[in-house]
A protein has these predicted regions:
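N-terminal single-pass transmembrane signal-anchor helix
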Residues: 2-31
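A generic fold-level signal
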Residues: 5, 42, 126-127
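A generic helix-loop boundary/linker signal
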Residues: 21, 40, 86, 91-92, ...
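Low-complexity, intrinsically disordered/propeptide-like segments
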Residues: 13, 17, 26, 34, ...
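Conserved hydrophobic/amphipathic alpha-helical signal-anchor segments
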Residues: 25, 33-81
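Extracellular/periplasmic head regions of type IV pilus-like filament subunits
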Residues: 59-138, 216-217
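Short, surface-exposed interaction loops/tails
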Residues: 124-217
Length: 217
């Protein structure tokens, strides 16, 4: 009897490899995007939880805790107060990516893998409001750009100075779009009118690495 068993030819195997490669190229970005979106949800929850704890502290003490004296990472400034001393948080939230880039606010550096905390003015009262910031992997969650955060300014003077950042004038983006026509680190403020490919309230970035999620209170 003839042997009816037949193996794959080299050409057939190459075709299978090519098909697998095409499928992987199509599916992998979607999987990575889904994972990034999941991490962004965790970032939003983390910043919201910190903000809630800060409001409880402010209600009890009449002020917000001071930032770290060096890098403006939220954990370094707030963990001992909000977790260890007051018990407002069981654990202090961190970025779901331990190697997430440090988020700079103004001229102050953040810390890798940590959220950033920075106090600003409110109604010309110093340190009466704050910014909590993280990276964002998707434009769906992003509401700010790195350029916007680096434009934040709080002078050392006890009285409000022109150009200082106030809660009432710091505007977040309604959405963030990616375009090569944008500045390197993204928009410094939301668009004030439709034009240049943006709608009023929108911001832009050249690279998703400049996407940020921010809570301002």
């Amino acid at each position: 009897m003839k042997n009816l068993k037949k193996g794959f030819t080299l050409v057939e195997m190459l075709i299978v490899v090519v098909i697998i490669g095409i499928l992987a190229a199509a599916i992998l970005p979607r999987l990575q995007g889904a994972q990034g979106a999941t991490r962004d949800v965790a970032r939003e929850k983390g910043l919201t939880d910190i903000s809630t704890a800060l409001e409880l502290y402010a209600t009890a003490k009449g002020e917000y805790p001071a930032e770290s004296t060096t890098k403006k990472d939220a954990e370094g400034a707030l963990k001992e107060i909000l977790v260890d001393q007051r018990g407002y948080l069981k654990d202090f939230p961190k970025d779901p990516q331990s190697n997430a880039p440090a988020v700079k606010v103004g001229t102050q550096d953040g810390t890798i893998g940590q959220y950033t905390y920075f106090r600003i003015w409110r109604n010309a009262v110093k340190n009466a409001a704050y910014i909590l910031a993280s990276k964002s992997e998707s434009s769906d969650k992003a509401n700010a750009t790195q350029a916007m955060l680096e434009g934040v300014k709080v002078s050392s003077a006890a009285t409000y100075a022109p150009g200082d950042t106030d809660f009432n004038t710091f505007q977040l983006c309604s959405s963030v779009v990616k375009t090569t026509r944008c500045a390197v680190k993204g928009s410094t403020a939301p668009a004030t009118a439709d034009g240049n490919g943006l709608k009023k309230g929108e911001c832009c970035v050249q690279d998703n690495a400049e996407l940020r999620f921010v809570v301002v209170r």
